[in-house]
A protein has these predicted regions:
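Glycine-rich, small/polar surface segments that engage phosphate groups of diverse ligands
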Residues: 5-29, 37
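Expand to "…catalyze enediolate/carbanion chemistry for C-C bond making/breaking, isomerization
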Residues: 140
Length: 140
């Protein structure tokens, strides 16, 4: 479990980690004997350059959002290609926003370490549909 708020609970219950975002941009451990994974949401390539202190980062929106209508891609393919070649996008950066199986090749070409999927799965009305879509993501 990774918490986006109430970070003191992560330490109290020895949870996996904390996730920083605009609401909660800082984390300071209460003790030295608990080191959680540390992640962050980024919405610009520039934000990734501070990424060395994080275990992983989410960059979004890579493509137009499926679940947030009108939330458009923030990056051109050229920007993502350049950031991937420069190592700014690397194995610790997770692509988020508008992810579908058809876009996995581009995501790999841009050097992302993985994908996070929301709307693509949320649009499925049944558990069987979600499992089918997850299988497509894994196999395609």
């Amino acid at each position: 479990i990774v918490l986006h708020d109430h970070f003191e609970l992560a330490e109290k219950y020895r949870l996996a980690g904390v996730h920083l975002n605009g609401r909660n941009p800082h984390y300071r451990p209460l003790s030295n004997d608990y080191i959680p994974t540390l992640s962050r949401s980024c919405h610009s390539i520039e934000e990734l350059t501070d990424g060395q202190r994080y275990d992983y980062l989410f960059l979004s929106p890579i493509f137009d959002s499926i679940s947030k209508k009108g939330y458009r891609s923030a990056f051109s393919p050229e920007q993502l290609t350049k950031a991937g070649k420069e190592g700014v996008i690397n194995e610790r950066v997770i692509a988020l926003g508008g992810i579908t199986p058809e876009k996995k090749t581009a995501i790999k070409d841009w050097n992302f370490g993985g994908i996070a999927v929301l709307g693509f799965l949320w649009q499925e009305p049944t558990i069987a549909g979600v499992i089918r879509q997850l299988t497509r993501l894994r196999n395609d």
